[in-house]
Amino acid sequence: MTLRSKMTKYIFVTGGVVSGLGKGVSAASIGNLLKHRGFKIFVLKLDPYLNIDPGVMSPYEHGEVYVTADGGETDLDLGHYERFIDVELSKDSNYTSGKIFSNLFTQERNGNFLGKTVQLIPHFTNEILNTIEKIATKHKPDFMIVEIGGTIGDIESNSFIYAMAELALAKPDRFFLVHVTYVIFLEASNEFKSKPTQVSINSLRSFGISPNLVLLRNSKMVPDNIVEKIAKKSVLNKDYVISVPDMKNIYEAPLYFESQNIAQIILSHFKIKDIEPDLSKWNKLVDSIKKPKAYKAKILMVGKYVEFLDAYKSIIEAFKVSSYEENIDLKMDWVDSSKLELTNLDEFLKGYDGVVILPGFGIRGWEQKVRIAQYTRENKIPTFGICLGFQAMSVAHARMKGIKNANSREFANDKNDETYILDLIQGKAKDKNLGGTLRLGNYTTTIKENTLAKKIYQKDQVIERHRHRYEINSKYIDLLEDEEFVFSGIWNEGKLAEICEVKNHPFYLGVQYHPEFTSRPLKPNPLFTSFLRVLIKNN
């Protein structure tokens, strides 16, 4: 079933009371159910902050930067969208106030406004609407899900809410609003309080707009009397006010939404006949999550931003979905590499089945990553390196080969005795700005025969997503390779090393790219799955 001959329908998702309610998972779950009904889905995240994109934001501020196939540096919610909906999104899927303002200022400098005073209303709000409509025209989805970041009442969100209200007024038959809000529970009095949710909905009404569907978030089910109270105060049918409790696993959300007839409510609003979705594969996924596991594995995640695990959100999800597929009870322990005690690694690593050396930027903890890469190689501990992890494994190998001061130019010091086996990618040396100057998005890697990488991928070429500025200096590739160590994946166009591995080792493989961005709940990336298989085989 498809609506491609019709105009795109817009489903907006907003949040109320507090942030971090799961708007992204809610939007992704709605997209999942509509996709399972045969509709074409596109998702847009509108973020009110003034950064052009999250590319140079601290992981502690924003979590991971999710990279799209076309090289967009975007919000981590896009990871939820791609994983839940199994759709490849693009740079068009994330716009910030900063990005929209930048476009607006360019137009102003070009004289497009004919000397008029440029204001938030109507010029900025018009630019928001133009952005939404251009994307809809370009991608031609049946449904375009638009998540607005932040919460209702935030000053920085007001222009987006105003623009949304304008769109609702202009296209009422193509507009649907889902409001995700938090219902407070007071432990002291053992009761739910609905007033903040009512205020949130009233704030929407002050813009001339009412939600079509309200999702009530809490760790537990919101009782019927509170649901009825909120529905009455919101002038909504009780069936359109739905309690959404915390779930043991986020992948249960689409099935819960289906049980609450959320897709039916949306389709009924647009006067579209519902069809029965085939959710058998998703049901099987959730069953695999819930069932008792046949195996156990424990891995050490060696990172840099471990105090805020959203910095590694896609890696965590990639390992989880692979563990579900392999029926493994997986435990991930996290350590800040800069705090590693290198003098007692024997004792520290005891009890771990494998080690993952994680991505990151900056010198803090770099030497410890190199040392642990050398230790796990020498002691035959299964090791998987991603991005900076690949670089640490390569530098460790170079030093083991006798290149005593092998290093990356990223971490150059004032000494003249270092050998930079990792250097700026050609063409990046002259870039003065940090933002948008990395090697980003999809690139094709050619895999060598008779290697672990070939055994894992079962392909001659693979396409994976990249986000880095430094690569193995091509003049050192032949020097570093030997009977034990091989660069098993190469980007032929620029002779860039993309995969390294060690023979005669249970598993010692690093990748310059980010395989976590192509892992899906129903199609796990084989690198994560293969790594876990080795762990349970060793056990």
Curated annotation (Swiss-Prot):
Any one Gene Ontology BP term: pyrimidine nucleobase biosynthetic process
Which annotated residues bind UTP?
S19, K193, S194, K195, P196, T197, Q198, K229
Reactions catalysed, semicolon-separated, are: UTP + L-glutamine + ATP + H2O = CTP + L-glutamate + ADP + phosphate + 2 H(+); L-glutamine + H2O = L-glutamate + NH4(+); UTP + NH4(+) + ATP = CTP + ADP + phosphate + 2 H(+)
Identify the keywords attached in UniProt to this record, alphabetized.
ATP-binding, Glutamine amidotransferase, Ligase, Magnesium, Metal-binding, Nucleotide-binding, Pyrimidine biosynthesis
Q: Where is the Glutamine amidotransferase type-1 domain?
A: 298-539
Q: From the UniProt record, give the pathway where this protein acts.
A: Pyrimidine metabolism; CTP biosynthesis via de novo pathway; CTP from UDP: step 2/2
Ways its activity is controlled: Allosterically activated by GTP, when glutamine is the substrate; GTP has no effect on the reaction when ammonia is the substrate. The allosteric effector GTP functions by stabilizing the protein conformation that binds the tetrahedral intermediate(s) formed during glutamine hydrolysis. Inhibited by the product CTP, via allosteric rather than competitive inhibition.
Q: Which residues form the active site?
A: C387, H514, E516
Extract the InterPro entries matched here.
Class_I_gatase-like, CTP_synthase, CTP_synthase_N, GATASE, GATase1_CTP_Synthase, P-loop_NTPase
- UniProt-annotated binding residues for ATP: G20, L21, G22, K23, G24, V25, D77
Has keyword Ligase? yes
Q: What is its EC number?
A: 6.3.4.2
Where L-glutamine binds, per the record, is at Y60, G360, L388, G389, F390, Q391, E410, R469
Q: Where does Mg(2+) bind?
A: D77, E147
Q: Where do the record's region annotations for Amidoligase domain lie?
A: 1-272
Q: What else is known?
A: CTPSs have evolved a hybrid strategy for distinguishing between UTP and CTP. The overlapping regions of the product feedback inhibitory and substrate sites recognize a common feature in both compounds, the triphosphate moiety. To differentiate isosteric substrate and product pyrimidine rings, an additional pocket far from the expected kinase/ligase catalytic site, specifically recognizes the cytosine and ribose portions of the product inhibitor.
Name of the molecule in the record: CTP synthase
